[in-house]
Amino acid sequence: MRHSLWLLLAAVLSLPAQAGTECRDIHDRDLRRMCNALERGDSGDCGDIDSRDLRRYCGALLAPGQRYDCDDIRDGDTRRQCRAIVRSDRKRCDDIDSRDMRRQCRAVVSRASWQCDGIDDRDMRRICRVILSR
């Protein structure tokens, strides 16, 4: 019985930390900036992102229908994911070619954080959790 309690404690301690540490652990600078903007919920922070597509994607997620628009995104998968999430249309997620982006899209549109665990890319998995923690 005592051994089971230690295993339970170890399992609890290994659970993902809160969203703040999620962003800090992201390697790619633009993805980290996007994560921080999403975490703070401030579309103004999206302006710090160097990548044109990620800047627009970030802004569209935080302020749909305002300054940024998913249709201005050049990358096809990013544009499709943006449209699906902003419109909460799970069927649009199926049109995304990248498996991880498709999984992230489904998790966010379904508001099912447990689905983030199925994403292979660690940075995308972290961003998925941050989006769903807002």
Which stretches of residues belong to each language-model region?
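Non-catalytic tandem-repeat scaffold regions and their flanking low-complexity/translocation tails
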Residues: 19-134
